[in-house]
Structures are given as C-alpha cells and as structure tokens.
Amino acid sequence: MLIIAGLGNPGGKYAGNRHNIGFMAVDAIHRRHGFSPWSKKFRAEIAEGEVGGEKVLLMKPQTFMNLSGESVGEAMRFYKLQPADLVAIYDELDLPQGKARLKTGGGHNGHNGIKSLDAHCGREYRRLRLGIGHPGIKDMVQNHVLGDFAKADKAWLEPLLDTLADNADMLVRNEDSQLMNKIALALGGKAEEEKPAKEMKDAGKKPASQSHIHQARNHNQPKLPATGPMADMLKKMFGKKGD
C-alpha cells in the first residue's frame, strides 16, 4: 500500500488557500481514479482505491497543518508501513507558480507540515512540492500562504492538478522524472532532459541567498478546458470572490 497525503488546513475558511494545494491535489486524484467516498479515520479524511494496479490510501489530515505528522504517522503504524510507502504533496514557496519537484528525503525548508511529518514518519519519504511562488518580501509570506489563489492562477493551477491526476500512476510506480516532465510540458515548459547544458550550469550558480526571490517570467499560457470536474471545482473556488 502507498499513502498519498495532501497537506493543508481543514474547513471552508482555508479551502482556497495556497497552503491547501496539497488537499486540492489529492482531491483531483480522488475524482479521477474512482476512489471510495471520503471517510474519517486517523484524524484525517481518507479514501481507498487503486491507481496503476496498486492499492492507495489518500489522506487529508484534519489536525491542521502543524500536526499533520500525527495523523499520517498513526495511519502508517496501523498499516505497518515504512517511510518509502508515503508520498506527501504540499505547497512550496521557493518554486515558481506551476512548477513541481519530486524527491525522496531532504529538509523541511521551514514548512511546518513537513517538520511534523519528519518527526512522526521518518524523513525518507517522497515529497512532491508544488510551487506557489514567493511574494518577494519575508513579511508578506504569511498572508501569501494563507491567502486564496487569485482567479488568474487558474491558468496554471488547473493544468497542474489535471496533469498530476491524469498521471498519478507514474507517482505510484516511482516514475518521478517522467511525471515531472509531463507536468512541465503541460504548463508550457520543456521536459527536464531537454534543458540546455548551459542553462543547468547557470542555474547551479544561483546564490542560495536569492532562493526566495523570483523574477516574473512570461510564459505561453496553455489553453484550458471550459468543462470537466477540475474546471467545475476551480470555478466554485474562484467564484467566491469578486473580480
């Protein structure tokens, strides 16, 4: 069994927050792959199903972000699972909007949900980070993270979540680089192996002190579907606020 845990905060007040993109991701997988209805166990909303022929448990901890590890750790102990049997999906300030990175282990980078998972689940689990961008000023981080996605964010958020859900079998089969390429291409970028060597070399020279500052970039926005489950969900989310 594989646990795919999306991190976020429970309740309608937080549903549209950037910090809740992990919840949005597992919701997308849930809809796309015919999981059981959501139920409550392990202080979480859980759903069982299969992806790519493998048994998967989706989790949305209801403990609030800072205690996510207590919920996920309880489920792992119940099913006698190891860190390798866990994938955590969460928001990442230090990635531009619409970018994704997937790796095993690593640090928490100040993310309280990941701090909690590290404490209760071990550190060698897979981490799927979904970029929400950085506001550029440290004092603005909290409002940015706990603020709702803007309507304009639909241009990258919908294809990101759609592509992740469509290719969740790659996530289950540990085909990490293939999944990252699918997401990059869906967002109008290039597959990882297609990056010029000079670009990779230059990227490695970027000072660590600048990691929180991202310059605005112009990308060709992908054409979005007007209908479908993801479109309906995002219309409801963005429709809560005026233009």
From Swiss-Prot:
It is found in: Cytoplasm. Transmembrane segments: none annotated. The record marks 9 as: Discriminates between blocked and unblocked aminoacyl-tRNA. One of its GO terms (molecular function) is tRNA binding. Disulfide bonds: none annotated. Residues 190-205 have a biased composition (Basic and acidic residues). Its main location: cytoplasm. It is an enzyme of class 3 (hydrolase). The keyword Cell membrane does not apply. One of its GO terms (cellular component) is cytoplasm. TRNA binds at residues 14, 64, 66, 112. It catalyses: an N-acyl-L-alpha-aminoacyl-tRNA + H2O = an N-acyl-L-amino acid + a tRNA + H(+). The record marks 91 as: Stabilizes the basic form of H active site to accept a proton. It comes from the Bacteria. Residues 208-221 have a biased composition (Polar residues). GO terms for biological process: protein quality control for misfolded or incompletely synthesized proteins; rescue of stalled ribosome. The active site is at 19 (proton acceptor). Residues 190-243 are annotated as: Disordered. Its EC number is 3.1.1.29. Keywords: Cytoplasm, Hydrolase, RNA-binding, tRNA-binding. Hydrolyzes ribosome-free peptidyl-tRNAs (with 1 or more amino acids incorporated), which drop off the ribosome during protein synthesis, or as a result of ribosome stalling. Belongs to the PTH family. This is Peptidyl-tRNA hydrolase. It comes from Rhizobium johnstonii (strain DSM 114642 / LMG 32736 / 3841) (Rhizobium leguminosarum bv. viciae). The gene is pth.
